[in-house]
């Protein structure tokens, strides 16, 4: 227990030292709150009793070597703010991300100090951006002026072409309306001669085809499928045409027989 207590007192005493307090006081002296150095044995609050620590000479024996106090330069190096090293960035630019858009140093973010620099970002003045914007605006303003002022003939041709196209469209629309009136069967002004028949046009057979079909009909009124295929191939007809012709020929023959039977007493 004695060794543990002595080690604990040793670490507390080493942490609460005069050197670190002087450094903290020098660092935050510029702030609004003034910090004063305090003795090592006095606590922060008045509620707690003061702790008394034994001196280093009495607490530790010879085997324990005293701790070397940290130099002010070493401690200051810990809290030293990071500064951008220009020679390193200029020497090796392979690791610089060129796809990031450089921000000017005047841009302030809520998490940064207004007077601090954005480290790792190349500062850029606003003069170059202003010149680029001004040149772009001049180009955009000059283009419509050039196009409008240098081609007066195009302005004159445009209304003429528009007038021609409008007249053509009106004439085409009138022509279409006349055609629709002529083709409309319900229109009262249309003559019955112009009405189109919905019946399909007949496909008359030639004299040679009708002669051969009559011979085949006199030989046999009903054709088999094979014979019908042969007749259609010889006469350059389809099987359906040959079939329909034979059906019509049989109906005609029945009518002729009825007429003969009615005429006979």
Curated annotation (Swiss-Prot):
UniProt keyword annotations, A-Z: Developmental protein, DNA-binding, Homeobox, Nucleus, Transcription, Transcription regulation
SUPFAM superfamilies recorded: Homeodomain-like (SSF46689)
Domain of life: Eukaryota
GO molecular function: DNA-binding transcription factor activity, RNA polymerase II-specific; RNA polymerase II cis-regulatory region sequence-specific DNA binding
DNA-binding region: 198-257
Sequence segments annotated as region (Disordered): 163-188
A matching Pfam family: Hox9_act
Presence of the UniProt keyword Transcription in the record: yes
Gene3D superfamilies attached to this UniProt entry: Homeodomain-like
Compartments where located: Nucleus
Gene Ontology cellular-component terms listed: nucleus
InterPro entries with a match to the protein in the record: Abd-B_homeobox_TF, HD, HD_metazoa, Homeobox_CS, Homeodomain-like_sf, Hox9_activation_N, HXA9/HXB9/HXC9
PROSITE patterns for the chain: HOMEOBOX_1, HOMEOBOX_2
Keyword Transcription applies: yes
A GO biological-process term: embryonic skeletal system morphogenesis
Function: Sequence-specific transcription factor which is part of a developmental regulatory system that provides cells with specific positional identities on the anterior-posterior axis.
Family that this chain belongs to: Belongs to the Abd-B homeobox family.
Protein name: Homeobox protein Hox-D9
Gene: HOXD9
